[in-house]
Amino acid sequence: MIRLMVGLGNPGPEYEATRHNAGFWWVDAVARQLKASLHAERAYHGLVARVNTPVGPVWLLEPQTYMNVSGKSVAALARFFKIAPEEILVAHDELDLPPGEMKLKQGGGHAGHNGLRDIHAQLGSTDYWRLRLGIGHPGVKAEVANYVLGKPMREHREAIDACIVRSLTAVDALLSGDMSKATLRLHTSKPPRPKPPRPVAVAGTGVPAAADAPRAPDIAGSAPATTQGDPP
């Protein structure tokens, strides 16, 4: 069974609506469905909720450490409650899936996602489950950092939100450990693909600009919010 459900993102209102926070959006939706309230827990470096379910207690977690040190939070809670990697599900934004699609998988590499990279390192294992929430790709590798820290266009946000709503039908299966049933529910229904964002021409050049959002400001004294596609 899944005993710990984690959503990845960056803390703070400036990041709340950005693509990189799709994991937070998912945990928020699960918390509403399970009638749970997240609260700050310094010992686990995140927002936490404990939910009593028919199959036992389940923890919800949103690390507040910034993306690239998410593993600090996940490992702290998992070790204290003796939760094995295969009992952990991490929901995160996925560049390689279009908005509105999702995939469930266990194990594998981090594919450049620094949140997953740190969880790998802190847990010492890659055996945890991942719920990959599609956000689409900007089409240019150099623009990935700007893209994930930008807000999705309305049509894309609606597709991601609808995907999250559909995923809630699999929560019971995830909690009971019926991963085949959960996978079937998560993978069978695919929505129409939203249109890609329209390139905006750079003034006076006729060349489309790849980025759709400004860079997030640096935050003094905090870990940088590094992202998928950043160099190690």
From Swiss-Prot:
KW Iron (keyword) present: no
The EC number(s) this enzyme carries: 3.1.1.29
Residues holding tRNA: Y15, Y66, N68, N114
InterPro entries: Pept_tRNA_hydro, Pept_tRNA_hydro_CS, Pept_tRNA_hydro_sf
Chain residue ranges for the region called Disordered: 186-232
SUPFAM superfamilies in alphabetical order: Peptidyl-tRNA hydrolase-like
Entry's Gene Ontology molecular function annotations: peptidyl-tRNA hydrolase activity; tRNA binding
Ranges of biased composition (kind: Basic residues): 187-196
GO CC list: cytoplasm
Domain of life of the native organism: Bacteria
GO BP terms: protein quality control for misfolded or incompletely synthesized proteins; rescue of stalled ribosome
Keywords associated with the record: Cytoplasm, Hydrolase, RNA-binding, tRNA-binding
Similarity section: Belongs to the PTH family.
Protein name stated in the entry: Peptidyl-tRNA hydrolase
Species per Swiss-Prot/TrEMBL record: Methylibium petroleiphilum (strain ATCC BAA-1232 / LMG 22953 / PM1)
Recorded name of the encoding gene: pth
